Amino acid sequence: METDGRSGGTGCSVKITIQMEAYMLVTAKEMLEKARDGKYAVGHFNINNLEWTKAILQTAEELRSPVILGVSEGAGKYMTGFKTVVGMVNGMLEEMKITVPVALHLDHGTYEGCLKCIDAGFSSIMFDGSHYPIEENVAKTKELVKITREHGMSLEAEVGSIGGEEDGVIGMGECADPKECKMIADLGIDFLAAGIGNIHGKYPANWKGLSFETLDAIQQLTGDMPLVLHGGTGIPTDMIKKAIDLGVSKINVNTECQLSFAEATRKYIEEGKD
């Protein structure tokens, strides 16, 4: 944007150029609603350091794809705090000239962690109240709906514990109660994570697969609410496609990135490139 400024009494015209901020975080709400309507899913990839963040942003820009950068509370602590993460990501968006939509999202947040991320400048948060009785999950989620709306952020909530381990929290991979999903969805959240037999980490050989019966029942009761599939690593492609057909608009991936990073690092060192 350009504007003319007049130097008082001299008759000289000074042209001032103001650079508008072109590279900035957005909420996940709009990108997931577009994904829902377009019958595709947006990838959520957890970041644990600068290298992961750079690789994910580069790939998203090359593919012209929106992306959600997920941060667990453990990763946030490792990177010295959520404000450090926000500063790093905002700086990289600008320096790398990232033009695709990018959301910075707290993954499996506690109530206290959600408040810290709101204060730090995240554009989206997930409150994981799945380990609480449904009444307490509802109460805390309701409070966060109000706060996130005031700050123009998007909010994900969870019903039914996702299996495996996430930041030291172990879930058994239960299937959520569709009626409880509706209770949480009706509070005004933007997207919903529900346990449908999915787990974090590697899937065991005896894994029974996703419960599409549960997913279909949840979708029927929550309407056009974008749904989230956690534990995306290792789920067969045909199951992924069917989940998207039934309303999944966001798929979380972390384990696959960890395995790839570890393998590449090990290979680099073994080849003596250090």
Please name every model-derived segment.
Residues 2-6:
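Ser/Thr/Pro/Gly-rich low-complexity, intrinsically disordered segments
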Residues 196, 231-233, 255:
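Active-site proximal loops enriched in glycine and acidic residues that flank catalytic Cys/His/Asp
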Residues 235-274:
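C-terminal alpha-helical cap/extension of soluble enzyme domains
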Residues 21-43, 90:
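N-terminal amphipathic alpha-helix/helix-capping segment at the start of soluble metabolic enzymes
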Residues 47, 104-110, 226-237:
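Glycine-rich beta-to-alpha transition loops that act as phosphate-gripper elements at the mouths
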Residues 28-32, 50-74, 84-99, 109-223, ...:
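Alpha/beta enzyme core
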